[in-house]
Curated annotation (Swiss-Prot):
Catalytic activity: L-arginyl-[protein] + H2O = L-citrullyl-[protein] + NH4(+)
Record lineage: Eukaryota, Metazoa, Chordata, Craniata, Vertebrata
Gene3D superfamilies, alphabetized: L-arginine/glycine Amidinotransferase, Chain A, Protein-arginine deiminase, central domain, Protein-arginine deiminase, N-terminal domain
Name of the featured protein: Protein-arginine deiminase type-4
E.C. code: 3.5.3.15
Modification after translation (UniProt): Autocitrullination at Arg-372 and Arg-374 inactivates the enzyme.
A Pfam family of this chain: PAD
Function: Catalyzes the citrullination/deimination of arginine residues of proteins such as histones, thereby playing a key role in histone code and regulation of stem cell maintenance. Citrullinates histone H1 at 'Arg-54' (to form H1R54ci), histone H3 at 'Arg-2', 'Arg-8', 'Arg-17' and/or 'Arg-26' (to form H3R2ci, H3R8ci, H3R17ci, H3R26ci, respectively) and histone H4 at 'Arg-3' (to form H4R3ci).
Entry cofactors: Ca(2+)
């Protein structure tokens, strides 16, 4: 809230002060009242509004003004109706009275000025003065909230540039300018006002490395935008002429919210009195605009797809052809990373997660680059980041990175309501160890801190360390569906698979085998059902998935009716450290690519019953009644044999939510 300095008056000599239009300035009546005074009256020029907070006046003075008692509860404020045309052109007279003293007067000469710092605090996309009752120095959530929003300028408008736009202190062009938030300083003063007064724009020193402010000046791009605040400068003294002026600023974020940064940045304009060169400058007035840096937001499977990413490598030509046909059916753009750029690293899902940032005036897709840094490490920087496509990462030391730091272990639910609490942007899901041990793996705390600090998609920790790779996308997915929730949660289910195989054996299909047409050992339904070792392994897997099932029901507000069990078997193998972990026994159907109503599902190569794969038939019977279309894609040799599936090998850029993140209440 804008604040003016307290004005003190004294009978000995006139007082001179500045009053900012629209701001109630405190006036100290009692501090220098003559000894013996018990009451006072006050008169002022027509352009000055005097407000006395007290009980009823004691009586009328001889001048016709009300007399007020001088008691400790007295509060007097002044407001100017308009800016002064010259210095000291408004006057306030205070008369003091006492039972045994004659009337004594104190004079106050006022200069009214208009001074305001405005930004888009109403979130309409345009900078304008805050409406009455809105304190622009605060930031509030919700549909009735207020406060300005700032984007991290993390895209790269110049394709030839080696870094993000915020990494330099220049405005490249008007497109670069559109990534920034406008802010305007409006002033109206007497012509010689700034001979004795100074305006200073400032940011707290602790926040100076989180923001950069450009001042618009006359001239051609880019020289007409001068850096006035940023990592090297926490304050800027404005040299202004008197009269009426408007000064435009453009503000860019330099850092996302994180464990050590809540995302709030106050920018303050201060008016200083420098009239006496022998004294330090005195603070006369301050106005502050509070900005919040927009969070990075993930998009769930229920959001419309816009672009699919995949790698080309020596073993996936047939897969690419199938994927191209599938994405064409879903009317979705397909971008293929060439082999020379991925260095045989086919795990596109693990390398990055594509989300977005948003302010009222601009929405920007932003890729979050994982710290795994294998063959695809340059792809997010060199091929995804660009004009109107931002980039963010959180670096880790190589020795600190585990498989759970890859982004197949980072998912987000559709919007949910949990025990009355709304999550209109869904909740982030990350995999972790169920309990700590010398061999346990977790997503690094630096990544978890970043995700939690965004505030709008409160993370949920799931148990995934039981898996060979350890990612949540190995046992769950979400698909759009009709109904109240608007989606279904798909969970891998050994129990459902055993039940199905048992029924088929009872019907006389025990000799039907998996992996028909593949160079794999023949495995019949009866072989699988008779293996106690495999049963024990899948009972363990089922217990792990059941644990997550209860967590998901509790943290996402789901019921059993919101969950579909996808038949799936696992087996236990040793990982690189020799620890027993689970991996899919046949291609993991829940690890699917969801493009609207079109599902690209790993072809399971299940037993053929009456000319059709019984696993495919079962999944279709579960999902097609929801209005979904199932396409089974052969990824056996290109992905499944390397511990991944269709979802692991692809990535999707999706349409941002229509819901505005600032309308929610975290």
């Amino acid at each position: 809230m804008a604040q003016g300095a307290v004005i003190h008056v004294a009978p000995e000599e006139p007082t001179h002060a500045v009053c900012v239009v629209g701001t109630a300035t405190p006036l100290d009546i009692r501090g220098s009242a003559p000894r013996g005074s018990t009451s006072f009256s006050i008169t002022a020029s027509p352009e000055v509004v005097v407000d006395v907070i007290h009980g009823p006046p004691s009586k009328k003075s001889t001048t016709g003004a009300s007399k007020w008692p001088l008691d400790p509860k007295l509060e007097v404020t002044l407001q100017m109706k308009a800016a002064s045309s010259r210095i000291d052109d408004q006057k306030v007279r205070i008369s003091y009275y006492g039972p045994k003293t004659s009337s004594t007067q104190a004079l106050l000469y006022l200069t009214g000025v208009e001074l305001s710092l405005s930004a888009d605090v109403t979130r309409t996309g345009k900078a304008k003065p805050a409406p009455a009752g809105k304190d622009q120095s605060t930031w509030t959530w919700g549909p009735d909230g207020h406060g300005a929003i700032l984007l991290v300028n993390c895209d790269k408008e110049d394709p030839k540039s080696s870094g993000m736009d915020f990494e330099d202190d220049k405005v490249l062009d008007n497109k670069d300018l559109q990534d920034m938030s406008p802010m305007t300083l409006s002033t109206k003063t007497p012509k010689d006002f700034f001979d004795k007064y100074q305006l200073v724009l400032q940011v707290p020193k602790a926040k100076m490395n989180k923001v950069r402010v450009f001042r618009a000046t006359r001239g051609k791009l880019p020289s007409r935008y001068k850096v006035v605040l940023g990592p090297q400068q926490f304050s800027h003294r404005l040299e202004l002429l008197g009269g009426q002026h408007s000064t435009d600023f453009y503000v860019e974020g330099l850092a996302f919210p994180d464990a050590d940064f809540k995302g709030l940045i106050p920018l303050t304009i201060s008016l200083l009195d420098k009239s006496n060169p022998e004294l330090p400058e005195a603070l006369v007035f301050q106005d502050t605009v509070m900005f919040r840096v927009a969070p990075w937001i993930m998009t769930p499977n229920t959001q419309p797809p816009q672009e699919v990413y995949v790698c080309r490598f020596s073993d996936n030509e047939d897969f690419l052809k199938s994927l191209a046909t599938f994405t064409k059916k879903a009317k979705c753009k397909l971008t293929v990373c060439p082999e020379e750029e991925n260095q045989d690293d086919q795990w596109m899902q693990d390398e990055m997660e594509i989300g977005y940032i948003q302010a009222p005036h601009k929405t920007l897709p932003v890729v979050f680059d994982s710290p795994r840094d294998r063959g695809l490490k340059d792809f997010p920087v060199k091929r995804v980041m660009g004009p109107n496509f931002g980039y963010v990462t959180r670096g880790l030391y190589r020795a600190e990175v585990t498989g759970l730091d890859a982004f197949g272990n980072l998912e987000v639910s559709p919007p949910v309501t949990v025990r009355g609490k709304e999550y209109p942007l869904g909740r982030i899901l990350i995999g972790s160890s169920g309990y700590s041990s010398s061999e346990s793996r977790d997503m690094h705390q630096i990544l978890q801190d970043f995700l939690g600090a965004q505030q709008v998609q409160a993370p949920v920790r799931l148990f995934s360390d039981w898996l060979f790779v350890g990612h949540v996308d190995e046992f769950l997915s979400f698909v759009p569906a009709r109904g109240k929730q608007g989606f279904r949660l798909l969970l891998s289910s050994p129990r459902a698979c055993y039940q199905m195989f048992q029924e088929l054996q009872t019907e006389g299909h025990g000799e039907a085998s998996l992996f028909e047409g593949l160079k794999r050992k023949r495995q019949t339904i009866s072989d699988i059902l008779s293996s106690q070792k495999l049963r024990d392994q899948n009972a363990y897997v089922e217990s792990c998935i059941d644990w997550n099932r209860e967590v998901l029901k509790r943290e996402l507000g789901l019921t059993e009716g919101d969950i579909i069990d996808i038949p799936q078997l696992f087996r236990i193998v040793g990982n690189s450290r020799g620890n027993p972990k689970a991996e899919a026994f046949f291609p993991n159907m829940v690890n699917m690519l969801v493009l609207g109503k079109h599902l690209g599902i790993p072809k399971p190569f299940g037993p053929i019953i009456n000319g059709r794969c019984c696993l495919e038939e079962k999944v279709c019977s579960l999902l097609e009644p929801l209005g979904l279309h199932c396409t089974f894609i052969n990824d056996f040799y290109s992905y499944h044999m390397y511990h991944g599936e269709v979802h692991c090998g692809t990535n999707v850029r999706r349409k941002p939510f229509a819901f505005k993140w600032w309308h929610m209440v975290p």
